[in-house]
Amino acid sequence: MMASRLSSFSSSIARWHGDEHAVASPLDDAEILSMRRTRLFGATGTVLMAIGALGAGARPVVQDPTFGVRLLNLPSRIQTVSLTMTTTGAVMMALAWLMLGRYTLGKRRMSRSQLDHTLMLWTVPLLIAPPMYSRDVYSYLAQSEIAVLGLDPYRVGPATGLGLDHVFTLSVPNLWRETPAPYGPLFLWIGQGISALTGENIVEAVMCHRLVVLIGVGLIVWATPRLARRCGVAEVSALWLGPCNPLLFMHLVAGIHNEALMLGLMLAGTEFALRGIDAAQPLLPRPLAWPSSRAQWQRWQPMAMLVLGAVLIAMSSQVKLPSLLALGFVAMALAWRWGGTVKAFVISCTSLGAISLAVMAVIGWASGLGFGWLFTLGTANVVRSWMSPPTLIALGTGQVGILLGLGDHTTAVLGLTRAIGVFMISILVSWLLFAVLRGRLHPVGGLGVALGGTVLLFPVVQPWYLLWAIIPLAAWATRPGFRGATIAITLIVGIFGPTANGDRFTLFQIVMATLASAVTVLLLIALTYRRLPWRPAPEPPARPPEQPAPADDAYAESP
């Protein structure tokens, strides 16, 4: 009974995928012109976002480089206008991304270089803008500085370790001033290097962290099309839905979140590991002997790819732990190649687990931070996130109790709903791992669904967490239902999610900026209605079927 349910569940998930034609017809001249205009429309949006961030972004409390500069300081004096600019720019970029979808999912598609140019064009304006949508980067600076001073960032927070009057602590939100670091030692080790390089210069440190984000995005862009090719998905389709997703520009590039590095290392590691597992030659060449020639070294290439992939995935978990799920699906793919037996399962899990523990031990020892991160994984649970269904249910139940006069039991219900959510995550992930082990599900698809379930049932969900699932699934899932749902979620969260720096604005300012942005976008649509592909492109007229030439004796029997 259980086996049949597993087969049915894994089969229903497997139906999200269907092979696509990797090569499609190129765009015609009219479509290329329309695509370029659309790309420019989106780039204009990111420029507006960057300008608006001078007033509406998450600027530092001290060492603000725009302070006192006549032109650059103007947006901070008209914050509602600045918020309108960032909101309008984000909507323009999201709509341009949506319009580009017809040139990546249709019968004629953009080339890889055209999509890469779009990605770079939309990224550049945000690289020099102040942080947006989050102040987490200032927590990164403070926690790294604590480590530089020789203190343990997993025991003390910025207020205790640096003092309330420190330049980094002043820019950290009050909620996080007393909390220890919830990030892995690799990320804090990188932060230590940045702090040692830049000292207490906030602007230089922020730009260095944005450079780290850019490296992570580069790894994402490198790995996603290769994983898509491995799964039988068109490269430009996967790149458009994943790395070109508006949430990546808004929250990873503009928001400077370490998810970029986590996802980049995880996806690159998954690609290398699967490259070794899917190789035609054996993983372990026989007989086992030290290679003495180039040909013999090449026989070890599949094993080298597998080990390199496992190391990269383990490194990604030392930025944020959820990416370690990828190693589980790689282990199941390896066990399936070895026959899917219990022995193969044990050997693959043991060997890859040993590599992972070795990498963690080396990073913990080299950084001097050890394994203290294991005790701060629940730090973010202090946030009550409405995007998390378990948390939302608890908050709603607590409010019902208050209305009925039963008291506020939100905290108690939170403990129950979050525990149930974690239990459901463990069941879902175990189910998916077994499906990959039996060969019913591709490991990339299993990883994407597992991360999607983790985000959905996680105690705390932030808008950028959605990219954990969207990017790997973009390389595997092709069904219109999945892509349509992903597009809808992206637009809803991207447009109606958090403002550029929501804690600084009143409800009146947010409402006014939203209305002004809506009017501005509608005017832009009206002005560009005939120049941009707002309407579906008409299908080319069908050619009438050619009549076959009559045979010589076609009318032989006619009177």
Swiss-Prot record:
Segments traversing the membrane: 41-61, 81-101, 202-222, 247-267, 300-316, 321-340, 355-375, 386-406, 419-439, 455-475, 480-500, 507-527
Record flagged with keyword Glycosyltransferase: yes
Enzyme class: transferase
UniProt region (Disordered), positions on chain: 535-559
Location of the protein in the cell: Membrane
GO CC field: membrane
Segment forming the signal sequence: none
Protein name per the record: Probable alpha-(1->6)-mannopyranosyltransferase MSMEG_3120/MSMEI_3041
